[in-house]
Amino acid sequence: AGKEKQKTIWLLFILQAQSLFLTFLIGSFETGSYSNIIAFFEITLQDQQRLTNSYWQNNALFAVFNLISRQTHPSFPQFLASIDAVLIDRLSELALNTNFNTDSQVWIIDNAIYDLNTIYKYLPVWQPTITLALTDVLSTYPYLSEPYLWAVRGVTQNSDCVNLSIGQICLSTTKNSLKAVAFPNTYSFDDGIQVVYTPLSLASIQPLYHALKQVESQFFRLIEILAPVSGDPTDTISMYVYGSLRDYRVYHPFLFDMATNNGGIYIEKDKSFYTYQRTSAESIYTLEELLRHEYVHYLVGRFIIPGMWGQGPVYANERLTWFDEGIAEFLAGSTPKEIRPRKALVSQIQYDGSSRMNVSQIVTAHYGDFKFYRYAGNFFQYLYTYKKDVLRDLIRALRDSNIAAFDSLVTQMSQDMSLNTSYQSYLNSLVLNVNTLTNPVTVAPDLANLSTNDPAVIQPIFRTTSTGHLAKCTTAAFRMNGRFSCRGMITGSLRSSPDWIAAWSELNSGINNLISTLETNGVNNFGSMNCGMGEIYFNKSSNQFYPLALYSCEGPLAFQTPISYSRPTQDQLDFRDTTFGVNSTCFTNPNPTLGTICNSSIATISFPKTATYDEMYRFLNWQFNDLKSEVFMMRPPLYKRMNCGLNSITTVIPNQTTGDKYLTATSTCSL
């Protein structure tokens, strides 16, 4: 009977705990409830075994911890006034109860410390008492353990360092020590543009680096411009890859003040993204898929959308949520020659059955639910397959900061019932063939056995192809992961109209044929080559049109010791070695913080008298973008801070009789 009575009391406390949390959710708090919190903690401490393997009992305890942390705030003065030494003592007892220091129950200790930290923050009168309790925590648990880290957070809320009875504790020092444990290895790629911090081996990271190269090349084919947006500050990217999900959950909040209810996250203002190695039981996505996804976020911010993520009117009301996540999921399926639908996404749609999202729901999706990711990713795949011009227009609108044009396109898609019907049919076909789909798995080239480290060997072989017969090749990056870069113009067939979709498909196929031709060459560097493509321009010839665009290919080089470039001499040589920068002049800016300045005179072709200014400007702007792209792709590490503007645009009419005319302008790039 006594055991039954205890069981009844315990169940009553569980119900009370859940009731307490519900009262918080509806915004009320009864004074009598405070005593129930104390009593709940006391019975927990007296009968700890009842927490073992009990979902409801653990859930109730978590609810009480959650209630305390949320109610301990100036918005809830009644609860603040109720806090006394008894509550602090009970929380301290829970925090110092080493019986809970197991993988399954350490959360109890962590939450108790968290609540003490919260009270410390909002009720200074209790800071001395809580400091003593947290000092005991620091003495009780191992250095850098979960409880230790939470206690460091608590005692250093008012300053980086604090002197305690056990000695000085510093938040920054603890973070540095933890970083050394969490990320013992640092791998630098592309001469420092990409830096990976991780406990994983280099052999594990190399395939991921080469996977990102595939994503990048397809991204450039999609957006058509190979240079960063003006003034973009994200000239490097740091990748923090934790060794496990547990490390991510334990270390990440302490090191970077971020939540971990995600598979990874990119923070543009920090020029960093964070993720972790995972098992198939922990995630349906591989580490490679997550890195591919997050890297697309970096590329979008650097090459499409000006400004920082979340800032500016373009991000208002989560306008870009579907776009950001959709393009990332889509491009995560990149290979050197195509962008493939991913089995991981289509399988989830298969399991959704009839509860699919429609186009209108996709383009108005908000964060808070991951379901739209798979639908947005495959909607991009659909547009890429059947309506590539719409995809182009969406991207151009964002790059031009033309919110009205972007919104108009989204509204049209949202209201187009036939579009949704077609999209759903496309999903049906994907689901029907789901077992033929794959997820990306990249194999790194054998860097130790590459044929050459010299672009002078690469260039003549490249020039044996029809597309690459005028290519110019350079060393794009040095050291272990050296890279070559080869660039040139690719042209398409004469046609009766400037059909962009047909032209893109033709030029894209031409680039893939170039890759296929070279990848079987005896020089094995070409086996891992990736190629991008710039903006397509249509030249008119006898009332017909032929497309042309810049292409840029890059691939691995064997180890090469870095060389130091002489600036501005090298800059001027590089600018003059482009299609439209032959007359460039580079000089050192008198203001040393601005580095080198390169001015390039650009002139369009001659247009007839009837040509409009907009028509001439489109050609001029194409030349300008081509110049920026060609220089940037020569040596991305050298030109990572390149910022260019077009000025002094002038209309020239050399022959007043015919009225033929052209535009001239000066491209000014700070490096």
Where is each model-derived feature located?
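Non-catalytic all-alpha helical scaffold/repeat segments
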Residues: 1-166, 363, 367, 435, ...
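Non-catalytic architectural context of zinc metalloproteases
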Residues: 86-238, 242-271, 359-373, 385, ...
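Solvent-exposed, acidic/flexible segments
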Residues: 201, 205-212, 281-292, 320-325, ...
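Sec/Tat-exported extracytoplasmic proteins
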Residues: 216-223, 294-295, 299-307, 331-336, ...
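Surface-exposed patches in mature extracellular/periplasmic domains of secreted proteins
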Residues: 220-236, 306-310, 341-344, 391-398
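Zinc-dependent metallopeptidase catalytic helix centered on the HExxH motif
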Residues: 269-346
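Active-site-proximal alpha-helical
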Residues: 327-335, 347-436
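Beta/coil-rich, acidic/histidine-enriched accessory regions frequently appended to metallopeptidases
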Residues: 404-574, 581, 593
